[in-house]
UniProtKB/Swiss-Prot annotation:
Role: Transcriptional activator that functions in response to the quorum-sensing autoinducer IV-HSL (isovaleryl-homoserine lactone). Activates BjaI expression. Is sensitive to IV-HSL at concentrations as low as 10 pM.
PROSITE patterns linked: HTH_LUXR_2
Xref: SUPFAM superfamilies: C-terminal effector domain of the bipartite response regulators, Pheromone-binding domain of LuxR-like quorum-sensing transcription factors
Designated name of the protein: Transcriptional activator protein BjaR1
Listed PANTHER family: DNA-BINDING TRANSCRIPTIONAL ACTIVATOR DEVR_DOSR (PTHR44688:SF16)
Domain of life: Bacteria
UniProt DNA-binding region: 197-216
The family this protein is said to belong to: Belongs to the autoinducer-regulated transcriptional regulatory protein family.
Keywords: Activator, DNA-binding, Quorum sensing, Transcription, Transcription regulation
InterPro entries in the cross-refs: Sig_transdc_resp-reg_C-effctor, TF_LuxR_autoind-bd_dom, TF_LuxR_autoind-bd_dom_sf, Tscrpt_reg_LuxR_C, WH-like_DNA-bd_sf
A Pfam cross-reference name: Autoind_bind
Null allele phenotype: In cells lacking this gene, bjaI expression is about 15% of the level in wild-type cells and IV-HSL is <25% of wild-type levels.
Domain HTH luxR-type: 173-238
Length: 242
């Protein structure tokens, strides 16, 4: 598919997810949407602190029961190189990009190898870092995946909005004020087209720093944790037209 086709897939997903008011129904929608990219497993979860258990952080999942039991009983999250990189990265990445030394870190190698036993030999994870320090992720796994430079931005957007929707279903809170200024709507609109803060500044004849400030303010008003999340929410609330 072209970048436009992937973008349309993401927008259709965002526009349709709002009708689901129960977590199982929303997860069915996520499963169907990500399934079109070849993914067979999904987990939406917080990342535990040292004094927390992984199982208590999970918001929703479509994992094989055997893998979830194995993962939690062996505390694999303590050794998982994907979780480790997720804490350090703000950008989504393929599981294979998470570094580890198989000889020095046999537990990390065990996690990655055993995942393959459950048709999770490849994957893609979207880190989520909240303004208050909350760490979470949407992790997708499978075997034959449609992962390329055109599909990844769409998956990023879909995962961010999917996380937000699941979280709000579990913890209903009023949406923050979405009264953006015309300039804030402009910068979010350009951001939705993949423009960087520098490029937005050039287009609008403002400095890069000013563009970044407008993006940050818009994200805060929308209750977003980052720029991609802000774009997803702005589209969902019809503040901008993609």
């Amino acid at each position: 598919m072209s970048a436009v086709d992937y973008g349309r897939e993401a927008l259709d997903f965002i526009e349709g997810l709002g009708v689901y008011r129960k977590v199982p129904d929303a997860m069915n929608a996520l499963e169907a949407a990500f399934g079109r990219f070849g993914f067979e497993t999904i987990i939406v979860t917080g990342l535990p602190n040292p004094d927390q258990r992984f199982a208590q952080m999970v918001l929703a999942k479509r994992w094989p029961a055997g893998w979830f039991n194995l993962y939690t009983q062996n505390n694999y999250d303590r050794f998982d190189p994907v979780v480790r990189l997720c804490r350090q990265s703000v950008n989504p990445f393929e599981w294979s990009e998470a570094p580890y030394d198989a000889e020095l870190e046999p537990s990390a190698a065990e996690v990655m190898n055993r995942a393959g036993d459950f048709r999770m030999s490849r994957g893609f994870i979207v880190p989520i870092h909240g303004l208050t320090g909350y760490e979470a992720a949407v992790s997708l796994g499978g075997v034959h995946l449609d992962l390329n430079p055109r599909s990844k931005p769409a998956l990023h957007l879909m995962a961010m909005y999917g996380f937000d929707h699941i979280r709000r279903l579990l913890e209903p809170t009023p949406y923050p004020s979405t009264r953006l200024t015309p300039r804030e709507r402009e910068v979010i609109s350009w951001a939705s087209q993949g423009k960087s803060a520098w490029e937005i500044g050039e287009i609008l004849h403002i400095t890069q720093r000013t563009a970044e400030e407008h993006l940050a303010t818009a994200a805060r008003k929308l209750g977003a944790v980052n720029r991609t999340h802000a774009v997803a929410l702005a589209i969902r609330h019809k503040i901008i037209n993609p």
